[in-house]
Amino acid sequence: MCFRTIVRPSEAARALAQEHLAVLPTETVYGLGALATSATAVGRIFTTKNRPADHPLIAHILNDKAAIAWASNVPPFAHSLMNEFWPGPMTLVFPRSSRAADFITGGQDSVAIRVPGSPIMRDVLQELCSLRDDPFSAIAAPSANRFGGVSPTTAQHAMEEIGDLLTDDDVVLDAGPCAIGIESTIVDCTADRPRILRLGKVTAENVEHATGMQLGGSSQVRAPGMLAAHYSPRASVLLVEEAELPKQAMPWGAGVIAPSGLPTPPGLVRLSEPATTEEYAADLYRALREADSLQLSTVVVVPPSGAGLADAVRDRITRAAHA
């Protein structure tokens, strides 16, 4: 491993401006960042992650003015979402402008855009815009892990997974654990009403309340995190409802992720016992990675109850169990 671990956002911005890669902290998960207008740099994201070329990337920008530069059409309801949830863990999908090249859109006519809430990520973006004298500069940054695997919520997770594929010009900006722990909500804004493409901390109810509109139905737009099997550790994931936990036959030595208050069945290894849904989201990926570090063959996961963020956590568990 010959990359540089750094603590100053300006160093990350400089590496990005020079078309190198940067592992970056956001409020959701750590991202593998590249200058979004550089085919060479973005191409390295796909190579490093072994990511399919038709799988679109999210362009991280500084503010809603930049969004208007990257999108060819921004409907009124999208402005309501920007005002309510940006900066923050929500990605919006628009018809793309000429700024958005095929290599970040997966060949689609749409582009996914987010204004991140992480102060450090915003500092990187601000510095990048200054270095390039372009206020609309963007960072393409999918999760900093191999495609289909568990997203990293610490810099160490990212370094363990892709560190051997980074060069001495690439950098890792370590800012500690991510606050939210699961990826952003993705909202399709290419039609006459919003449609949820990926669940996250911003809930369907939040979107409907902010826009005053009912959500639309299915969408043909491709977005990150929509594959049936995703977010998967090497261990097999067994989703078990709370009522079934005492009756479920489970392999001896399996790991357990379950809300606090639920006992650990005999012979199993407790990996996480979050007290709230927010704690569950923040700790889920760390616990799945711990299962792999302990070389467990199976992880039994009891999802959180409720709706909203709990639905997003259940979505990640369900996709992990499909692998």
Residue locations for each model-derived region?
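Active-site-adjacent structural elements in enzyme catalytic cores
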Residues: M1-A323
